[in-house]
Each structure stands twice: as structure tokens, then as C-alpha cells.
Amino acid sequence: MSRECELTGTKPMVGNIVSHSQIKTKRRYLPNLVQVTLRSEALDQNFRMRIAAKALRTVDKLGGLDAFLAKAKEEGLSTKALKIKRDIAKKAVA
């Protein structure tokens, strides 16, 4: 299981801890990932995903998974999220 958000593609970043004496030590900044179940109103299904807490706030702000995926660019999404996005688009056309 990778440490990557399925909706935004947020991954761990690398940086430095800098002490008072300016000694730099490498460290990793991990995304705040949470396991959540999101509901798609268009597909009438629940989806279990591992997403960043920031992405969860954005999903709530935009009004749900369907609205988030409609606005989201495809390059940050996981294969699972891409499939859900395409299924929602097909359902909207039909």
C-alpha cells in the first residue's frame, strides 16, 4: 500500500530539519492519509478510498464525490478514481 492520495495524488515530500546551529538533517513529510468510504449519488454506490485529509475537506466543500471528480484533472487520480469518474460521466450522458 503506497502512501499516496487516490484523489489528489499527494505523495511524501523530502525536506530538511534545520537545527539552531544550522545542521541540516533529511526527513520525510508524509501526507495525512485516512481510509474513508465515499458515496457516489450518480452511481448509487459506496467506494472505499485512502485519501488525504485535505482532499476529504475539498470533497465536502464541493458537495460530494461526484462533484469533486467532475472538476478533477485526470493526471492526479488513481486508476480506481479514473474508473469511477468515467462511470459517472457515462451515467450522466445516458
From Swiss-Prot:
Residue ranges crossing the lipid bilayer per the database entry: none
GO molecular function, one term: structural constituent of ribosome
Keywords: Ribonucleoprotein, Ribosomal protein
Keyword Nucleus: no
GO CC terms, sorted: cytosolic large ribosomal subunit
Matches recorded under SUPFAM superfamilies: L28p-like
Biological process per Gene Ontology, one example term: translation
InterPro entries hit by this protein: Ribosomal_bL28 (IPR026569), Ribosomal_bL28/bL31-like_sf (IPR034704), Ribosomal_bL28_bact-type (IPR001383), Ribosomal_bL28_sf (IPR037147)
HAMAP family with a match to the protein in the record: Ribosomal_bL28
Family (UniProt): Belongs to the bacterial ribosomal protein bL28 family.
Name the record gives this protein: Large ribosomal subunit protein bL28
UniProt organism field: Hyphomonas neptunium (strain ATCC 15444)
